[in-house]
Design a protein with these regions (language model features):
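Catalytic, metal-anchored helix/loop core of enzyme active sites in primary metabolism
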Residues: 1-383
């Protein structure tokens, strides 16, 4: 039996991970659960899974914690993440919190010699070099939970140590796959939130519409698989059945296919290298009939170009891209800027911030704050 700490247990990834624990009680024991502010949902999870540690990063008084969940240790604020990631003994730590706080949690878990399952994009986007160095020091791979990176990771298990020459990173294309750049400029919030295949939170759904989600995944893939950005090709695949693929020197391409169901990559990370039933529907290729593929378009979706530019620039460029995009998306979701302004704000922030170092966590957090400040100023002018 494996013990698991889940950071961000009330979100989409966290709740699906707990579904798998519920399905396989003989496989897993939950030792820590954290949430940001969904206290009632967290209380329910604590009652069911009875962890040793539970916490809320948005603190509440201990008097507001129900008597029947006080059997475990409660931690509030940022300390909740640190306690769950590094203090409570756990075989593995699933980091599914949103935002750059995930970087600190990943580093804390690695520092405590934990097996880390990463469902937080910011950890690798902003601090990929630090994360991979720390993982190398303890001799444990970073296990990706993103469906695309999990697909690549799974394909590489059958590669016999052969290194790929190209990664094919698939993308649904989002709701604006067939729109012109001009049409996208003034797309509404409701239009951008209509994802064709996946049910996700508002931020990641907007990122899918702008393809900044795929830009972040290019950066993640670079660090996870030590692949230069020019060898990572985005392939638009509207059916979301091929989750990604790898190409080898002999021309062979290995791909991972399946219905869109996040329980599959979550379960693979939780049981690696074994596989367990997930409750996912079997893939029926006959009912799908046709799989189609298109090249990613960096003209209509500037995010695809910016990912490679930021990786080649080095330093804190990827951190600046990430922070600026978060601020721009937040402004768009408040109906303060048009959809087309998101990429303009990110490009403007990258230009204004220039070269910044990313040698330490402090450097990265400073660059993130500066990017957010600059992006907010630019967004204010576009209102």
């Amino acid at each position: 039996m494996q013990t698991i700490a889940i950071l961000g247990s009330t979100g989409s990834i966290g709740t699906q991970a707990l579904e798998l624990v519920r399905l396989h009680p003989e496989e897993f024991r939950v030792v820590a659960l954290t949430a940001r502010s969904s206290r009632e949902k967290l209380f329910e999870q604590v009652r069911e899974f009875r962890p040793e540690v539970a916490g809320l990063t948005e603190p509440i008084p201990m008097s507001e914690i129900p008597e029947d969940v006080r059997f475990c240790r409660w931690v509030m604020g940022e300390e909740a993440l640190r306690a769950a990631a590094a203090e409570v003994p756990a075989d593995m730590v699933l980091v599914s919190v949103v935002g750059i706080a995930g970087l600190q949690s990943v580093m804390d878990a690695l520092g405590a010699n934990r097996q880390v399952l990463v469902a937080n994009k910011e950890a690798l986007v902003t601090g990929g070099h630090l994360v991979m160095d720390a993982a190398k020091r303890i001799g444990k791979p970073i296990l990706p939970v993103d469906s695309e990176h999990s697909a690549i990771f799974q394909c590489l298990q059958g590669a016999g140590g052969n290194q790929p020459v190209r990664l094919l990173l698939t993308a649904s294309g989002g709701p604006f796959r067939t729109w012109t750049r001009e049409q996208m400029q003034n797309a509404t919030r409701a239009q951008a939130l209509k994802h064709p295949n996946w049910s996700m939170g508002a931020k990641i759904t907007i990122d899918s519409a702008s393809m900044f989600n795929k830009a972040l995944e290019i950066i993640e893939a670079h660090w996870l698989f030590d692949m230069p950005p020019e060898k990572i090709q985005v392939v638009v695949h509207p059916q979301s059945i091929v989750h990604s693929a790898v190409e080898f020197a002999d021309g062979a391409v290995l791909a991972q296919l399946g219905v869109p169901d996040m329980r599959v990559p979550i379960a693979y990370a939780m049981t690696y290298p074994r596989r367990i039933p997930t409750g996912s529907k079997p893939l029926d290729l006959f009912s799908i009939g046709t799989l189609t593929f298109e090249p990613g378009d960096p003209v209509r979706f500037p995010a695809l170009r910016l990912a490679g530019e930021c990786l080649n620039a080095g330093g804190a460029a990827c951190t600046i891209l990430n922070g600026a995009n978060e601020m721009a998306v937040a402004a768009f979701l408040r109906d303060e800027i048009p959809f087309g302004a998101i990429s303009r704000i990110v490009e403007g922030t990258l230009e204004a911030c220039g070269a910044m170092p990313a040698d330490t966590l402090e450097d990265i957090f400073h660059a993130d704050l500066e990017a957010r400040r600059v992006a907010k100023e630019i967004a204010e002018k576009l209102k």
